[in-house]
Amino acid sequence: SLTLSSSDQTMSDGPFTSANNHPDGQFGHALIKGEDLILEYIQSSSSIDDARLNISTIYHAYKDILGFYNTESERNCGNNVACDEGEYSDQIRSVIFLDMNGYICSAVLINNTSYDLTPYVLTANHCVDSESPGEHNYFTFYFNHQSSSCNNSNSYYNHYRTGSTLRASYYYSDFALLEMDYTPAASFNAYYAGWDKSSSNPQV
């Protein structure tokens, strides 16, 4: 198994096994706070498989995009959704903070007409069109990354899933549809947003 942690042991991710790999063998993980990263690999002495660990990419976030250090900062670029009167309390839980190998975009978890909770994610084509084939495997999907109250309180950064497959995209309408490798955990309390093609007024 593989575990990643910060040098001061205040954050860790894992343990992971080969079962966490994308079908092509690739794997990505969430951001870890700090200047140093510790990788700990443990393998049973009875294992007959050879360990193969290839680190293809390392990136350092030069901005505190997850609020590790400044959790009470004002974000004047938009309204705090926690300050609304509850009209969109469900839809808020569908919004995703999408980390694409050091680039960030917003996205939304959407439902489908089969209502089978396939974890489809809608985002913009311009967010993913520069990615090389296979890089979607490293995408990290953060849920509940918003202030938990109207006074800019802490947001979550431990509600996440990594890995996805690009299912569809179109340049002119600027959309991209991803399918996450894993469904959101029940503890995320994620909401599947959606729409239909009927002429009925939407209900929120």
Region roles according to the model:
Residues 8-36, 42-47:
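Beta-sandwich interaction modules
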